[in-house]
Regions:
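Short acidic/glycine-rich loops and adjacent helix/strand connectors
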Residues: 1-316
Length: 316
């Protein structure tokens, strides 16, 4: 048994890279909570932090090099900017740039709004579907802050991280976000409320812009305009079409991995093991199918036989 759980984001990157058809690529991973990483912070305090967003430089046969990583946790602790962290824990030589914050990552902000709208955190697709019913609203505070212009992070006044599972909207702090008292404990569908719809609009537009900024930063770092995207936020198909339009202006090609869920990490692990063993530099073709398992085909004769066996009536 080979345990690769210490490189969760790298497995996402491998899945996307080896299925993209690109010979080399810039990988951008935007995830809820990747590898759990214990860190000894200030005053000797131990904190658990998590992979949030990562940039990789990918080449055959199996060079997937970490360039940048955003780690986050519940805190509180002082944020660290422009840190040089050892890449040894990801089975790499050298170092990479790292930012550590005590706030939610891009995906966790989306999950917080998903919970606020009355859904389970894993049902972010429903928030994506609610987004077009909302509109810009000045009563909603910015979901991200620019930290003095040096880097952008989640606005902790709005989103309270509860790692490793989900996050929460600090709704009582902001008048517009509060749930009406007559609705709080009795409403069956929170999505009928204006504040839910408008916050769904805000989180979709703001998070997809954050990811676009990250992609452009990643391309600037690598100089490679072949981009692969994965991690939980990669399942946001509304955002993916937004990137296609925007990246086309910069001559950037995008492959958004359809298996961006954690199911893709198992595929990525298999790809890494295969290339480490074979050292093959053969560029794999673009993956044009999601159906990777065994195929099953039935004809009318077989179905009829099963119907006879169980005394069923076959209707065409």
């Amino acid at each position: 048994v080979v345990d690769l759980s210490h490189m969760h984001h790298k497995l996402h990157a491998a899945c996307a890279f080896y299925r993209s058809g690109f010979e080399t690529a810039t990988a951008v991973i935007v995830d809820g909570a990747g590898t759990f990483i214990p860190l000894n912070m200030e005053r000797g305090e131990n904190h658990m932090v998590f992979e949030l967003e990562t940039i990789f430089d990918c080449k055959y046969p199996f060079e997937i090099k970490t360039l940048y990583k955003h780690l986050g946790g519940n805190g509180p602790y002082r944020s660290g900017y422009d840190l040089e962290m050892s890449s040894e824990q990801y089975d790499e030589s050298g170092t990479h740039e790292c930012i550590i914050t005590d706030g939610a990552g891009i995906t966790k902000v989306y999950e917080a709004v998903t919970n606020y709208c009355g859904f389970q955190a894993i049902e972010a697709g429903k928030t994506m579907g609610l987004f077009p019913y909302g509109k810009p609203n000045k009563g909603i505070p910015p979901l991200f802050t620019d930290a003095g212009g040096e880097w952008t992070c989640a606005n902790r006044h709005v989103t309270i991280p509860t790692y490793p599972n989900s996050s929460r909207i600090n709704e009582d702090r902001f008048k517009f976000l509060r749930t009406p008292k007559d609705k709080k404990w009795g409403v069956d569908d929170l999505t009928v409320l204006e504040n839910r719809r408008d916050l769904a609009y805000a989180v979709q537009t703001e998070t997809q812009q954050q990811v676009l900024n990250l992609i452009l930063d990643a391309v600037e770092r690598t100089g490679n305009k072949n981009v692969v995207l994965s991690g939980g936020y990669g399942l946001n198909c509304v955002a993916n079409y937004f990137y296609l339009d925007e990246l086309n202006k910069h001559g950037i090609k995008l492959y958004a991995e359809p298996i961006s869920s954690d199911a893709g990490t198992a595929i990525g692990a298999a790809y890494i093991a295969h290339h480490q063993i074979t050292n093959s530099e053969k560029v794999l073709p673009f993956a044009d199918s999601l159906y990777l398992g065994p195929s099953y085909a039935y004809d009318d004769k077989e179905i009829g036989h099963l119907a006879d066996t169980y005394g069923a009536t076959l209707e065409k």
